[in-house]
Curated annotation (Swiss-Prot):
Gene Ontology CC annotations of this record: plasma membrane
Catalytic residues of the enzyme: E132
Catalytic class of the enzyme: hydrolase
Protein's name according to its UniProt entry: Protease HtpX homolog
Any one Gene Ontology BP term: proteolysis
Gene Ontology molecular-function annotations: metalloendopeptidase activity; zinc ion binding
Organism encoding this protein: Burkholderia mallei (strain ATCC 23344)
Family according to the record: Belongs to the peptidase M48B family.
Keywords for the protein's UniProt record, in alphabetical order: Cell inner membrane, Cell membrane, Hydrolase, Membrane, Metal-binding, Metalloprotease, Protease, Transmembrane, Transmembrane helix, Zinc
């Protein structure tokens, strides 16, 4: 429940930030235009982002004939989660990783790299796919798409303010210092909120995935193994399209940074600790 409340508050914050920046650029008319642009971008992302991401990663759809064990595993977990059977994809990449996409449970897809199938045991793989199906069940793909779109739009509006300035309610030019401050700080604030949303949804998918599989320890073991392997194996497509990193079960990008604030995923150690606590207590709330 806490993660859902936190997500709702963060979504409200990123929307408010977007509208406020629009207002600073063009007053009440700017706020209205900014909101309409955001709605249009979210609509496009909602309908087409899954196709774009799967094509971007050159994901190949598989079925029971081409990947029988993997396909049956997903089907069994989808049944346990009371979800429609998603489309199943494989990505020919060495880094162990996986993600879910699709605008709703009826149009969902799950994808895994060939690397993750080589590295994980069947039990660990069940934990990973249960995590991805939890994202589908919670409609996290929609949430992450909206937050990413809004963060990108905030950055675009901030750049507009930097180069063209803004107007107040009476149409007079806005304070140029304020415009520069907005241009510098707003994209950072938008990105921080987006990443906080992503971290909250990962925790919730860990909890939901453990509930679907009934085996939180399997997911904990999988996360530990993925973390150790992924850090030493580059994922070129993800590096070229870093905005898609938040979709993965583990951050696929190399490099460091301010771990707690500028990460799309919670610390692996904290995720494992929470899962092991679920395994010990049998509680998933």
């Amino acid at each position: 429940m806490f993660n859902w409340v936190k997500t709702a508050m963060l979504m409200a914050a990123i929307t408010a930030l977007f509208i406020v920046i629009g207002g600073m650029i063009g007053g009440s008319r700017g706020m209205t235009i900014a909101l309409l642009i955001a709605l249009g971008m979210n609509f496009f992302s909602y309908w087409f982002s899954d196709k774009m991401v799967l094509r971007m990663y050159n994901a190949q759809e598989v079925d029971e004939a081409t990947a029988p064990q993997f396909y049956r595993m997903v089907r069994e977990l989808a049944t346990r989660a009371n979800l429609p059977m998603p489309r199943v994809y494989l990505i020919d990449e060495n880094q162990p990783n996986a993600f879910a996409t699709g605008r709703n449970p009826e149009h969902a897809a799950v994808a895994a790299t060939t690397g993750i199938l080589r590295v994980l045991s069947e039990r660990e793989m069940r934990g990973v796919m249960a995590h991805e199906l939890a994202h589908v069940k919670h409609r996290d793909i929609l949430i992450s798409t909206i937050s990413a779109t809004m963060a990108g739009a905030i950055s675009a509006l901030a750049n507009f303010a930097m180069f063209f300035g803004g107007r107040d309610e009476n149409g007079r030019p806005a304070n140029p210092i304020a415009g520069i401050a907005v241009a510098l700080l707003a994209p950072i604030a938008g990105a921080l909120i987006q990443m906080a949303i992503s971290r909250a949804r990962e925790f919730e998918a860990d909890r939901g995935g453990a509930q679907i599989s009934g085996d939180p320890q399997a997911l904990a073991s999988a996360l530990d193994k993925i973390h150790r392997y992924a850090s030493g194996i580059p994922f070129q497509t993800a590096e070229e399209h870093p905005a898609t990193a938040q979709m993965m079960i583990m951050n696929p990008l190399s490099g460091g940074g301010l771990q707690n604030l500028f990460s799309t995923h919670p610390a692996t150690e904290e995720r494992i600790a929470r899962l092991m606590d679920m395994a010990r207590t049998g509680r998933f709330d």
